[in-house]
Amino acid sequence: KCDLADPAVTARWIKYYEEKGFFVSPVNSKNGKGVRQVNDVIQSACKEKIERDRRRGILNRPIRAMIVGIPNVGKSTFINSFARKACTKTGNKPGVTKGKQWIRLNKNVELLDTPGILWPKFEDQTVGLRLAFIGSIKDELSNQYELCLLLLQYFKEYYPEAVPSAYQIDPADTEVELLKNVAKRRGCLKSGGEYDLDKAANYVIDDFRNGRLGCISLEQPENRLLL
């Protein structure tokens, strides 16, 4: 989902992993940008194996790879974009992919799709927060209002213009006041005219996850504990 991330931060992540010897290719599975380059990356990563097979007389055997990752990061959308057809069910929530399946992407690559996986326990609360922010942890398991305040706290320090610019509202001294401004702009009111901050919080979180607040990254290679 490079379309949702801060491009400057993404560039630093690419450099970070390439320096560690990884093959890296940022993609936007929605419009297909970068998806075709993944095939070249796979061929480069498996170059030695391909040459070894050829010396043994094994020709045109497809590379078998596995796609793994945490829930709700676009694995199935990437597969469908790569294969140019709807091979897997997608949805902007964790747990859509239920089981493993082999998918023939092209004559050169077969991919094993797998359900999203999470650590059984988070040693660092920051990791859990980031996963909750992007929807990799089910929303039912967290207080969305409190989660939104923490997200706004992060925005205030690292992307201060994101929320005021997206909603055309004034900045505020506190996260609660900023959320009230969002509620006012979006018409989130309870009976009696009180602001519905829970509803406003859901708007902010959903808009963040869908890129409507701009391109934002929650972590940088040079500072792994931003929050």
Regions found by a protein language model. Name each.
Residues 3-69, 87, 187-189, 195:
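Canonical P-loop GTPase G-domain recognition
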Residues 11-15, 19, 36, 40, ...:
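Solvent-exposed alpha-helical segments within well-ordered globular domains of core cellular machineries
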Residues 14-16, 84, 127-131:
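Glycine-rich, phosphate-binding/catalytic loops in enzymes
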Residues 23, 91-227:
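Helix-rich effector regions associated with P-loop NTPase G domains
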Residues 49-53, 80, 86-92, 158-163:
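Short, structured loop/turn "capping" segments at alpha-beta junctions
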Residues 58-60, 82, 103-104:
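Solvent-exposed alpha-helices and their adjacent loops that cap or buttress functional pockets
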